[in-house]
């Protein structure tokens, strides 16, 4: 479980004017909150080894930049879609900013020797049969896990950040679905992960 304290989950916003959720484990307690700027994100990332980000971290093969015309979907996106999971393509308005920011931050973090992976909370919720916007159901899942979580209202950004963190934990446990292609990889926590020790709270 000590390794889990080296995982940081980020529900990245496309703009530094909007909230980015973060989540990590410290002394068996989930620390959850929001921040805004790239500088704040890079600062909080210090001391972690695995960063899980809810944002596209690569471009489709054949697309040279987010501004130029090109393919809308990566191979990993097509695999995700084939499995029945809904998502927004990187070419959609707000997703352009998110993709650009995600790629930039991932590049900086990787240059510092950190492992950075893309994840998608929406797919995790779908796998577990939870409505993506049902905060009460999502929070109920988190409270069933063997970690302390402050009893307070949580924003969707914060809840999704916890989902990102959990994807990192499940990745370390080897219990994830990996949608991998030549132009990107998306890691999603599986239901099996939540029914396996030590996540299966007794």
Predicted feature locations:
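Phosphate- and other anionic-substrate recognition elements at nucleic-acid/protein interfaces
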Residues: 1-202
């Amino acid at each position: 479980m000590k390794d889990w304290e080296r995982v940081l989950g980020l529900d990245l916003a496309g703009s530094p004017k909007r909230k980015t959720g973060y989540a990590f484990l410290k002394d068996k307690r989930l620390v959850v909150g929001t921040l805004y700027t790239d500088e704040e994100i890079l600062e909080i990332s210090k001391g972690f080894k695995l960063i899980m980000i809810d944002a596209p971290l690569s471009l489709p093969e054949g697309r040279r930049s987010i501004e130029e015309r090109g393919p809308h979907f990566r191979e990993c996106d097509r695999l995700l879609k084939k499995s029945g999971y809904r998502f927004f393509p990187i070419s959609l308005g707000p997703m352009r900013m998110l993709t650009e920011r995600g790629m930039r931050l991932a590049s900086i973090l990787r240059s510092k020797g950190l492992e950075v992976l893309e994840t998608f909370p929406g797919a995790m919720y779908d796998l577990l049969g939870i409505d993506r916007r049902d905060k009460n159901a999502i929070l109920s899942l988190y409270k069933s896990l063997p970690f302390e979580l402050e009893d307070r209202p949580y924003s969707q950004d914060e809840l999704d950040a916890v989902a990102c963190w959990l994807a990192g934990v499940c990745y370390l446990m080897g219990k994830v679905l990996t949608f991998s292609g030549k132009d990107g990889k998306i890691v999603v926590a599986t239901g099996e992960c939540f029914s396996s020790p030590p996540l299966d709270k007794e």
